Amino acid sequence: LNPATTTAAQVIDAEGQLLTPPFVDAHFHMDATLSYGLPRINQSGTLLEGIALWGELKPQLTQEELIERAMTYCDWAVGRGLLAIRSHVDVCDSRLLAVEALLEVKHRVAPYLDLQLVAFPQDGVLRSPGAFDNLQRALAMGVDVVGGIPHFERTMADGASSIRLLCELAAAQGKLVDMH
């Protein structure tokens, strides 16, 4: 636009400071945020050990602690310029405790943070008994996006089948898809 052809409602002199659009975190796992050392430290530093530790921690989680840690993270994120986050939330626990907690967080932060939730079958939608039903329940509760982890299925064929299954579900419900 030519500055001479538009009139600003307000002019702010940033005095040489940098002004940018807000940051976006397009891939996060807010249900696991601030859980370092729980139930213990990942000694190998590998993803597989991290996933195993998460599996050990899930039965011990409470909704209150999930909400508290997620709210702390959201406050930190906004303070550093993040105003949109897409977070995966594990749906392999039939209690859907993390889903309930992050839906509550989404409601609380809605006035200042765009939090989009992905129903994520951490242990594989085909590999983990009940995961597909849990994923559908999470979507019915208000989760925004269908997630998947095809490389974590038992075989490449199962991985391909999981992609088809999840994409068909997303298409039927008019949802986006975000797979690892």
Regions found by a protein language model. Give the residues of each.
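Active-site gating loops and adjacent loop-to-helix segments of metal-dependent hydrolytic enzymes
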Residues: 34-66, 142-145, 166-169, 173-175
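Divalent metal-binding segments
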Residues: 44-97, 151-157
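Divalent metal-coordination and catalytic microenvironments
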Residues: 16, 27, 81, 146, ...
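Histidine/acidic residue-rich metal-binding segments in metalloenzymes
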Residues: 97-111, 127-180
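A cross-domain feature marking catalytic cores of carbohydrate-active enzymes
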Residues: 89, 117-122, 148-150, 179
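Histidine-rich, glycine-flanked metal-binding segment
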Residues: 1-20
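Short, acidic/polar
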Residues: 65-76, 126-138
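Di-metal (Zn2+ and/or Mg2+/Mn2+) metal-binding site signature of metallo-dependent hydrolases
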Residues: 17-39
